[in-house]
Amino acid sequence: MTSTSPKSRKPSTKTTKSKSKSKSKSKAAKAAAAGASPALARTPPQFRNRVIDKKALKQLVAWAYKTHGTAVTASMADNLKDLGFRYATQAAVSISVEDLKVPEAKQDLLGQAEAQITATEECYRLGEITEVERHTKVIDTWTETNERLVDAVKKNFNQNDPLNSVWMMANSGARGNMSQVRQLVGMRGLMANPQGEIIDLPIRTNFREGLTVTEYVISSYGARKGLVDTALRTADSGYLTRRLVDVAQDVIVREDDCGTTRGIIVKAEDGGFGSRLVGRLTAEQVVNVDGEILAERNTEIDPPLSKRFEKAAITEVMVRSPLTCEANRSVCRKCYGWALAHNELADLGEAVGIIAAQSIGEPGTQLTMRTFHTGGVSTAETGVVRSTVAGTVEFGPKARVRGYRTPHGLEAQQSEVDFTLTVKPSGKGRAQRIDITTGSLLFVSDGQEIEADVTVVQIAAVAVKKSVEKATKDVICDLAGQVRYEQVIQPREVKDRQGNITLKAQRLGRLWVLAGDVYNLPPNAEPVVQGNVKVERGQVLAEASQASEFGGEVRLRDSIGDSREVQIVTTSMTMKDFKLLGESTHSGELWHLEAKDGTRYRLNTIPGSKIGNGEVVAELADDRFRTQTGGLVRFAPGLAIKKARSAKNGFEVNKGGTLLWIPQETHEINKDISLLMIEDGQWIEAGTEVVKDIFSQTAGIVTVTQKNDILREIIVRSGSFHLCTETKALERFTGDGQIVNPGETIAKGINSEAMVFVQTVDTPEGTGLLLRPMEEYTIPNEAQLPELTHVKQPKGPHLGIKATQRLAFKDGELIKSVEGVELLKTQLILETFDTTPQMTVDVEAVRDKRAKTIERLRLVILESILVRRDTISDSSHGSTHTELQIEDGQSVKASDVVATTQILCKQEGIAQLPVVQEGDPVRRLIVERDEDTITVTTNGSPLVEVGQRLVDGDSLAKDEPSSCCGEVEEVDGKAITLRLGRPYMVSPDSVLHVRDGDLVQRGDGLALLVFERQKTGDIVQGLPRIEELLEARRPRESAVLCKKPGTVEIKQGEDDESITVTVIEADDAIGEYPILLGRNVMVSNGQQVHAGELLTDGPINPHELLDCFFEDLRGRKPLMDAAQEAIAKLQHRLVTEVQNVYKSQGVSIDDKHIEVIVRQMTSKVRIEDAGDTTLLPGELIELRQVEDTNQAMAITGGAPSEFTPVLLGITKASLNTDSFISAASFQETTRVLTEAAIEGKSDWLRGLKENVIIGRLIPAGTGFSGFQEELRAEAGPHPDILAEDPAGYRRMQNLRPDYTVDMPAAPAASSTAVLADPSDADLEATRSRHGIDPAASNFAAFVRPTGENELEEEQLPDPSALEGLQQEGLLTEE
């Protein structure tokens, strides 16, 4: 489509009105009529005969807009819409089941895939490939089949039914895409399980044919994952956008041109060359090969110019970029380039930061959280080269190859360098030359004779080593039998830091499992048969016995169901002096023990339960120590307690004595004080209502406790009250009070007959003494214990009962209660003197032997033995038969056998015992049955020996292949006996779970295959990857990076495990990089490496990368240049990485958006040494600010500051902005504001957020001119002069703050370059240009300050000059 000059953009005024009414006109004619612009009038309408699909329609509208402006485009789009609807109505495009046509080729393709997979399974069965290689091959086969099926679908529609509705919709871009059509008429393909692993059973059907139940369930996995992912993505994407907006909100286009000479280089090799140049400005002349200038510096690159560059074979162009813009704290128009909304240079005041943030954040929801790992390399990446001639392969002298096994288990060689391979023909003809790149796979060897059309090499698409990750897969045994290693494996023991030993295979080789019937033996079973002995069916193979630990009386439970429990009573004790009485109450059964004298003990347990050592069996039911109310406990001298293990059990009495009890009634109340019905200190009678609905139970003096008008407690203290004025007596009994003995004088005229407790109290009548009565409780020294009868076994644990007295309270403790409490409890406690802490005792009720009506309590210690049941033959244990060796009531000694279990043979054969370490028990044995061997008779003489292992197809005799896998057991003439088996391939470094000679059951794990799978960048993908890049996260196990350039040498450690990569640098210094275990070295000996290059695989730490670049450049360049170049390298890398993620998902974002964000992340440096500047070490400062400061130091001769560049993630960068208002509104508000207050920060309100928060107009869009006006107003009284004289204006703006001016000084806003004072010649030129009288010139007012910043007398402007200025109207009164 042609494009006219941009000048014809604005349509003529009559455009919009002249909308053609006639429907019969052609589309081109309509467009011409609608937009009769001068350009169209001059050029004949173009005729394009092609299908217009979505893409072409986009181009058409874009062309119309660019060439003819908005009105014409709108009109044309309207006409196109009418045209489209009209024909859509007539064509009646709809969709029905009939439209879904399945290609006939599908069955053939599926058949081919099935055949390939059968072959793969056969290879696996013969032990030629590992489980991992099988899985990879199956998945790759299905992936390839699916792709071929898609091609078949396209071909079928194109050839047989091009107007099919489904095909038209998908093809034109109206609705749907190929992947959906594929599922409708191709096959759904492979699905992932919830862990993200691919299930190697694909969905072969499509929605037209319908899914089977299994396929339906498998496909619902993916559906669920899709829904959940979408829900999570929305939130993550929103938060990413918020952080991006926050970091870039103050990036506004504030200048026309910053004047920088720097730029970034866009290279053709990075892809998308033309489209990446459009909308940029060139940073230097672009010259083609012949020296012709294609574009001058600062030329806007539009699509035609970018096409010219591509035609002229230009490979790189230096363009201006936000990354290199030198505008202070903003971006200039020329560095930013086109605003993509209207394809013209961005206007001043455009908020490009926010546009950038939204452009990156918005596609976030489209990115998948992570796609699935599809196994091997897809065929698209690699090119297979076949031989064109038959002949001999020659590698040539430069070739370096190493052995390699492909992911599908094929043996090949991998090239380590680039070289040329030649196939020399055996007859006449030209030799075939193939260029081999590093990493290509060769399927032929040097000197090999090959035929024509043989796969020679698989060329690696790009000579790049992909990073890999370790993964594991279990190898599960398919049959029971005995494990045999092949010698090749060379297993070795590896000890880790914890001292655990694992067995690892050193080489690729096979594990064999030779068939047999494996029996699992129960613990403590001993084999009865010897190795290599013939056994019959039903013969005992092993025997296990169960013995009693303590011995005692046997008690066989009545067969409850099928319980096989044998109980042995080890120790028992009957309480003969107590009757056991039970009674039923509403709360359950209550049991009592009644002694002969009638005392009763409450039983704490019930018969049939278990109790442990130290637990209470029974408690004395005794009311002698029960009080009426709460009160105060006092111990008389002599009463001693020892603290129990826990206070909740109370305190054990050591020595008896007297316990004193002072009763008082305590009501705990939480009610409003208004409900109180008595007053503090008042005397009340029993039954008085103290608070609404609460009555006192005793008479006495009331004490009320309240807090914040809420009643807490009401205490009633009973006793006799005496008013008293004697100060000495009152003082004596103040506080806690005192005990007074009988007959002792308390105060004048107050005596006591009994022992009392005296306290001073205040009442409404006055202060006096309260004599409180005391109760005495006598506690005996020891609790009385009735007679008990013991039965003690010689070896069994001892059983006893101990009586203890326990006090519930300590001396001086106040019990707040209205009801009474029990002060002393007498308890019977169980004692077992046994070593095992978990020993429990059974409580039983037994009939008395003499008096049958009476029940007694019996405590017994039981040993319980569970006897195995008989099992009829099961797959792993064989038949077992168990016999009891005892009878009910029999007495057995310790370690007597109670029961024996026999393991019986299921089928006759030869029994063998496994090889075990000395002292280890035998846990399994194997019987080799007749069905585990096969005898083959050969025609010729056998070529095999005993012990040799064969797989299908191996020769038994000449031209006689074997039909099964196994080990040769004997060769008798021409009869060969094979023991059947199954080989399993294990790869190097696999962990072996079994040793040579071990016995395994079906389903046991044999080994753990450790394999490397390529990370095709899809492990962390989509949003998480973008976030990782923009937050500059440090990866956990990052790659080792080269710090200085040089030549690589790889050294193996002594233990063959550790590797050290040494780099011999330019000045012969040696850099050593120890490589951790399990890391892949990405370089080879003699290779030249650069700073920041990967030495091992793994994710790159961006911070470390920046350090590598900077340290390398610092030695060769000035500090400032080194920092700028290091930052530029990192910026390029970050932009590329972010773009790669978006491109992989098919999202296109213009580079400049990412550049704006990356610029914010890399704008700061950390001060290391401040020199003579006012900066602080460790401070984060803008690079440009440091540059200005160091320039000033260079002028004054001070020492400049030293610094290192830093990379900040978007969150950190947002929190480190100059504006504390913006930072505080983002995160960690308190911390940001506190720090700002402590440092006394000022916020210059440069960004959008700060102004919105304060409530000002934002300095962007239309508000930008207002912002500029402010600057100009500050700049001086002559805005017209400044506008006409930009040099003068810039000088005014750039005056340093320590100039004194008789008007507000301009802030250094647009540039921080320090300019000299205006020279006399400059001033003269400006005055004469504007016809200003020198006496009245505003420049006369500029003067230099002194050190004290005060103007000296003679420096003051001449008063007459000022007067002249006022008269001219150039200076106001102010």
Curated annotation (Swiss-Prot):
Its cofactor is Zn(2+). Zn(2+) binds at residues 258, 325, 332, 335. GO terms for cellular component: DNA-directed RNA polymerase complex. It catalyses: RNA(n) + a ribonucleoside 5'-triphosphate = RNA(n+1) + diphosphate. Binds 1 Zn(2+) ion per subunit. SUPFAM superfamilies: beta and beta-prime subunits of DNA dependent RNA-polymerase. Coiled coil: none annotated. GO terms for molecular function: DNA binding; DNA-directed RNA polymerase activity; zinc ion binding. CDD domains: RNAP_beta'_C. Residues 7-28 have a biased composition (Basic residues). The keyword Zinc applies. Keywords: DNA-directed RNA polymerase, Metal-binding, Nucleotidyltransferase, Transcription, Transferase, Zinc. One of its GO terms (biological process) is DNA-templated transcription. NCBIfam families: PRK02597.1, rpoC2_cyan. In cyanobacteria the RNAP catalytic core is composed of 2 alpha, 1 beta, 1 beta', 1 gamma and 1 omega subunit. When a sigma factor is associated with the core the holoenzyme is formed, which can initiate transcription. HAMAP family: RNApol_bact_RpoC2. DNA-dependent RNA polymerase catalyzes the transcription of DNA into RNA using the four ribonucleoside triphosphates as substrates. Belongs to the RNA polymerase beta' chain family. RpoC2 subfamily. This is DNA-directed RNA polymerase subunit beta'. It comes from Prochlorococcus marinus (strain MIT 9313). The lineage of its organism: Bacteria, Bacillati, Cyanobacteriota, Cyanophyceae, Synechococcales.
